[in-house]
Every structure is written in C-alpha cells, then in structure tokens.
Amino acid sequence: MPLHHQQFSEQEQFVLNVLNNKKNGYYVELGAAHSINGSNTYRLENEFDWSGVSFEIVPELHKEVSKNRKNPCVLGDATKFDYIKYFQENNFPDQIDYLQVDIDSGYKLNGRPQGNAYLSLHGLISVPLNKYRFSVITFEHDANMYWRNTAMRDAQREILDSLGYSLVVREIHEDWWVDPNVIDLETYRPFFKWNTL
C-alpha cells in the first residue's frame, strides 16, 4: 500500500496504515515544530481523536502549536522531562501507539550548531523505554545533513533493535520502527524501504 503524499506527513500516514486507522490512540511527540501542515500528529489528534503530548523548545513554535491544537504542548526541553510522572498522571497506557522523535530546532549543546548535538538521541534515551513500549517510532537523525549524525543514527538503531523493535523504513534522514509484538509482519511488510545504510 503506497503512502499518501499530501500536506500531511508520510510518517503520520504510516502510523495510520500500520495501526489500521486506529481511533483514540496515544502519541508522544518530541519536537512539535509545526502545528498543522507538516505535523506528524495533527491528523491523529483531529481526525482520529488521539490523546497525546508534544514538546517544543522554541517559544514561537510552541505558541503556534498551543493555539492550533487541543492536546498539550510542553514548552521546554524534552530531554529533561519526567515522562513516567506525566504518563501516570495522564493515564497513558503501557503500550503507547506512537513516539515521534525530531529534536533539531532551537537547541545548542556545547556550542555546536543545531543538528550536530545528538539531541534526538538524547530525547530518545530520556523516554522510559524500559517501562513503556511504543507501537510505532519515527526517529529523524538527519545523517544526510551532518556527518556526525551517522553515529547518532547508528546508536538509535542499536538501542531500538536491542529492545526488540523492527526497522521498517530506513531513509537518508530518518528511520521508522514498529513493535512486532503489536504489529504483525504482514501488516508492515508492504512498507519496507531501505534506501541507505
């Protein structure tokens, strides 16, 4: 089944496809950036009634997301958040449907330019992956833009592979994963795409 190209993201369409257009799901979005067009969670929230939480560190982008979306958007550093407390207080299930990791705007770490600070990796390991599972994970590593990010790409692959996730889409700038305990091979097999190392 091909992904639909439109104003909404391919990641979001992938989530809907492999979860059979699930209603009332849950998402966690590290790096919200856009509230509607280009968002990886807008349709999930507005057309499929998903609950979730987004994180954005850039005040202007946070303001836009908060204005245009019903689910909360936290203004702050997604790498320093108490996820367990938040998930428990907001009744998130142990098996959360979607984790989106794309932290690359507004951060500077150790004086490095944006994108070279392994921030998406920091975000990924900040989430309690040993306590919560995610049915789908999309991870933007931007290895095509910053040569240092190939190490970040490889590290997230080792982490998620060791936790039993299956890599379905491997692109020059992002990876898409599924939990094979929740999504069977026949469902995600049509989406296999490995276009890069």
Give residue spans per PLM region:
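SAM cofactor-binding core of SAM-dependent methyltransferases
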Residues: 2-84
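Short secondary-structure transition/capping segments
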Residues: 65-67, 86, 179-183
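Short amphipathic alpha-helices and their capping/turn segments at secondary-structure boundaries
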Residues: 16-17, 87-91, 124-129
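Conserved acidic-Pro-Pro-aromatic motif
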Residues: 42-43, 48-51, 94-101, 105-197
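Glycine-rich adenosyl-binding loop in Rossmann-like folds that engage adenosine-containing cofactors
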Residues: 58, 71-74, 79-99, 103-113
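Glycine-rich phosphate-binding loop signature in dinucleotide/nucleotide-binding domains
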Residues: 20-23, 89-96, 131
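Polar low-complexity intrinsically disordered regions
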Residues: 1, 15, 110-114
